[in-house]
Amino acid sequence: MFVQEEKIFAGKVLRLQVCTMEGAEWLEEVPEDTTVEKLKERCLKHCVPGSLEDPKTVTHHKLIHATSEKVLTDSKTVLEENIQDRDVLLLIKKRAPPPLPKMADVSAEEKRKQEQKAPDKDAILKATANLPSRNVDRTVAQHNMRDFQTELRKILVSLIEVAQKLLALNPDAVELFKKANAMLDEDEEDRVDEIALRQLTEMGFPESRAVKALRLNHMSVTQAMEWLIEHADDPAVDAPLPGQTPSEAAAEAGASSAEATAGPSSEAGGEEAKDELTEIFKKIRRKREFRPDPRAVIALMEMGFDEKEVVDALRVNNNQQNAACEWLLGDRKPSPEDLDKGIDTNSPLFQAILENPVVQLGLTNPKTLLAFEDMLENPLNSTQWMNDPETGPVMLQISRIFQTLNRT
């Protein structure tokens, strides 16, 4: 019996089920070495007779493996595409690409976009060059619009002075602020993040240095580690943090004697208590003195700015490096000296704040004064005090009064 040579060496024959989107189904028997393109031609010849007269018909269709949802590559064989016997294939016509727009259409679209584009400053000035100027004072009115966060600092400075005077009249003020001062001491000296401290000591740093580094860097392990490495050879690295000065110690020592000897009817005792309260106020403010972000200081100094200028910029901009850089490159306003200036006490805004009953009651609360001091040096803590049941109503009234007067 005569057998064709290609039949002898032919590969395994697979029976494949082919489907179309129109619902036609049939079986195709193909050797496993058949290319996907040849299989596609056979499928098109079966379902669309005469379609192969157009050579583009094959390229406009694709075969998809139904199980894996994979589009088969024309140049690969059935074996290379890992098609098995009895697999189902889907013959689909490819989506025609959108026609390219004509040049006239492109020009019309660009012209339409240009017509709808908002005019820039130069175009406005050119179009209005021949018009008479009117309402030129509007620029001044707009310039006088005040930002709440900018004015809040001035308001707080002035309110702190008022609160200090009111609290100085309270015979229990010294005792109240001694307790508040002790709370600040506890926060600074006793509350050290144990986990952060353990991480640094496990790296080999002495505990005393690790504690100092954490306090200087707001309990940030990364910044504390950088500080320890940078100051490893510093002879003053083991020096204690600035604490009580001799005058402060004497003031506290005098406090106990003043409590024992001074009474409400003693004028001399009242003066001593007032001086002691002033010292406590100064001590509280010193404890909240500004500490610049060391990484921001280094980054800005590398740009060529002087260290003092960098510290001033960070203080004015609440340790925000980008804002500090803009301040250094700009007109440098507000100046660091402006931060300690209060609002005009005769202004309608400040008078309206002082006349508010909620504010008046809050100014007699030592916690309000501590909140004002904290927000003065740490503006990011404003949200915390806004949510506090004692200080929140005071801050809310200040905000409402400011917004009301700022709109008039």
From Swiss-Prot:
S-S pairs: none
GO (cellular component) term, any one: ubiquitin ligase complex
Subcellular compartments: Cytoplasm
Compositionally biased intervals (Low complexity): 245-268
Listed Basic and acidic residues bias regions: 108-119
Pathway the protein acts in: Protein modification; protein ubiquitination
Domain UBA: 185-231, 291-331
One GO molecular-function entry: polyubiquitin modification-dependent protein binding
Main location per the UniProt record: cytoplasm
Chain intervals for the UniProt region annotation (Disordered): 100-119, 235-275
The UniProt record lists the keyword Iron: no
Residue ranges of every copy of the Ubiquitin-like domain listed in the record: 14-98
Any single GO BP term: protein ubiquitination
Residues of the STI1 domain: 356-395
Superkingdom of source: Eukaryota
Keyword annotations: Cytoplasm, Repeat, Ubl conjugation pathway
Gene3D superfamilies: 1.10.260.100, DNA helicase RuvA subunit, C-terminal domain, Phosphatidylinositol 3-kinase Catalytic Subunit, Chain A, domain 1
Keyword Repeat: yes
Free-text note regarding domains: The UBA domains recognize and bind polyubiquitinated proteins.
Subunit structure: Component of the KPC complex.
Functional note: Non-catalytic component of the KPC complex, a E3 ubiquitin-protein ligase complex that mediates polyubiquitination of target proteins, such as CDKN1B and NFKB1. Within the KPC complex, UBAC1 acts as an adapter that promotes the transfer of target proteins that have been polyubiquitinated by RNF123/KPC1 to the 26S proteasome.
Protein name per its UniProtKB record: Ubiquitin-associated domain-containing protein 1
Organism of provenance: Gallus gallus (Chicken)
Lineage: Eukaryota, Metazoa, Chordata, Craniata, Vertebrata
Gene: UBAC1
